[in-house]
């Protein structure tokens, strides 16, 4: 039999999953990743730990599958996006810890760029906002703060990459310095229309072109792993940032198809085909996974606190002993009893973009119980996601684009039936949970399988995607609108306070 290996390098852990060619997981291995917090608002990872943990899980997954490396047709890589690394081309040694996407140290750089009036240029070329979230200002910070970095960069001695490029470099023994369009599109340095690094943006951020990796489609033969690393020289044949990989793994290949990943945060992406559309409603435009030369786009919105609100119920409020207990507690009451929970622990993301907002629970009464608060906490995940989809709908309506007719879901919290039903009720469209919810890793495997001939085309992949359960809306539309109005009122109170 033939198999595909997906390397899934995430923020909290490195994972590897072996898939059969039907897209079914055969074996998985996972190792947690140490989080480094040098100062408040700073988040880093050790690049060597990223590499070693990823290699260890790959070897473990192959062993657990009971197969030889020679049975693997191709390797796909998916990764935490925006996290920024800088290393020496000759030695492969990192100059500094990786600066993680959550890191906010470059806000002064971003503020200066906004003051210079650069927002319109950045938005038009990249589809993004000027924000510390993205890689470009992190790279500028490294060049300016690591002793000797600018001088080494000027001599062509350094390489920049997001996590995928770092892994490709390490897996190929430094022979390949490359990334894919989805990861490049998250840097603030990449023209998503022309599919190339942009000289004007590089100049704006004072980044030398010599640092940059080559950029290829997501489904592409990047190179081969060193034979000694995994037991055979395996083709690295697919790369995509985690959210675009999940969109691909959900078989969202056509305009209007959308997925929401319910993790620590929530990431909602809608495929937009070959149409670049700049959002007027607080969303960003990003490159979708690309299987050929033609640019493909997605509209994206991110929620900062999704499943993390359940962690807070467990660790902060101590209302539950385990995250899995939240559904039973929430179902101990018929509804939230008028309680609305706005979990703005770290501000509000899209479509509000209120970084200074802080969490609030409104509508408390003498009759409020922990059950009501737990239910309101779960519902907050659905409310925030519904606000994103409403913003996407307004953008689509403004340009005559396709409206979302169903939402495909994945991520750890998608197994919560109460949450998924409430999500469908708010949206007024079916919410579909697939049989295989490891869609991020599956997307990377699919991309690798396409470029190596395991799959003939997107139609074949579409047929492999199968629903496990569909949640149909049960609320009258008027009631859903009333609930969303209550949510928006609570958000306004939170922001005003």
UniProtKB/Swiss-Prot annotation:
E.C. no: 2.7.1.30
Gene Ontology BP annotations: glycerol catabolic process; glycerol metabolic process; glycerol-3-phosphate metabolic process
Protein name: Glycerol kinase
Protein task: Key enzyme in the regulation of glycerol uptake and metabolism. Catalyzes the phosphorylation of glycerol to yield sn-glycerol 3-phosphate.
Pathway annotation: Polyol metabolism; glycerol degradation via glycerol kinase pathway; sn-glycerol 3-phosphate from glycerol: step 1/1
Family from the record: Belongs to the FGGY kinase family.
Organism: Leptothrix cholodnii (strain ATCC 51168 / LMG 8142 / SP-6) (Leptothrix discophora (strain SP-6))
Keyword presence, ATP-binding: yes
Entries under PROSITE patterns matching the protein: FGGY_KINASES_1, FGGY_KINASES_2
Record-listed ADP binding positions: 11, 15, 264, 307, 412, 416
Keywords: ATP-binding, Glycerol metabolism, Kinase, Nucleotide-binding, Transferase
